[in-house]
Curated annotation (Swiss-Prot):
Descriptive protein name: UPF0251 protein Swol_2090
Pfam family, one: DUF134
Coiled coil feature spans: none
InterPro entries: UPF0251 (IPR002852)
Source species of the chain: Syntrophomonas wolfei subsp. wolfei (strain DSM 2245B / Goettingen)
Top-level division of the source organism's lineage: Bacteria
Similarity remark: Belongs to the UPF0251 family.
Amino acid sequence: MAREPRCRRVEYMPRVECFKPAGIPLSRLEEVQIKVEELEAIRLKDYLRLEQEDCARRMQVSRPTFQRILVEARAKIAYALSSGRAIRIEGGNYCMGAGYCRRRQREIREGEPCDFKGIAIRTESDATDN
């Protein structure tokens, strides 16, 4: 069973949550969802032109994890643009800088890592094992 992904540090929240082709109502378009941390990866690497290692450090993930996030984001954007779909930015596993952890629903101090690992749920087999 895969572990719950850790929060990715995000420094920027987009003011716009949806992009779509001009002239077509959103209700008639299929959407591609871009996670907030995927947009952050695109912003850091492609817009700010930082090195991947610096991007990974800012998002508090390993370089290979950053690479996977970036590749996934680029693929989604390419698919949406080439097939005329809307792009919706929402969701994901992220914390806002030294501010708020969306998943833990609490404030995070400067330099404090977000180590959210999900909520442990006891099953009946756990109770009988004790």
